[in-house]
Amino acid sequence: MKPFVIAIDGPAASGKGTLARKIATHYRLRHLDTGLTYRGVAHALLQQKLALNDEKSALAYAKKLDFNTLKPALLSSHELGEAASKIALIPALRDILVAKQRDFARIFPGSVLDGRDIGTVVCPDADIKFYLLANIQTRAKRRYQEILKKGAQADYHEILAHLEQRDSRDITRTQSPLKSAQNAHLLDTSELGIEATFKIACALIDPIIKAHIIE
């Protein structure tokens, strides 16, 4: 049976990661936050005090990166997110990680992948695709509150500026720019909580996953 794949894309702080985890738990599917794969490489470079534009080292770390060792708690900092978005501009690095992400989707009977190019590049043939969006003020507020909950200090306006820069990098990069797949379900989470978003997504997934099982 062909693996069942759910693709979830969207900009930073749109809620895609939280939705992906809830969906994976609900349907008992494997989950991959593809952003962590870029963060993992960025973390390795910074740990060795190497420049983020050190392409040779970045490619070497990407090739030997074991997705099973990626720890969200270790890789979730804002600084690593910024670093990851910068190394993601390296075409050869994206090629390596995209190939490994596709392998992940092939290996397991069912999986949920979230990122910025899942429905368009990594898994264009995914069984169902979602694209989450929210206005930038809402996303900045979410990120601000996330940081405060961790006991760290944060500046809302600084976060807003960083998100604007991140969106610009993601949307304008030449390889795998952030955009919605033509056949993706658009979910605007600006006014939606995670539970409401989850219910909408499940209502769309249920008939498709049932049909897949019957096949």
UniProtKB/Swiss-Prot annotation:
Disulfide bonds: none annotated. The keyword Kinase applies. It is found in: Cytoplasm. Its EC number is 2.7.4.25. ATP binds at G10, P11, A12, A13, S14, G15, K16, G17, T18. InterPro entries: Cytidylate_kin, Cytidylate_kinase_dom, P-loop_NTPase. GO terms for molecular function: ATP binding; CMP kinase activity; dCMP kinase activity. CDD domains: CMPK (cd02020). Keywords: ATP-binding, Cytoplasm, Kinase, Nucleotide-binding, Transferase. GO terms for cellular component: cytoplasm. This is Cytidylate kinase. It comes from Bartonella quintana (strain Toulouse) (Rochalimaea quintana). The gene is cmk.
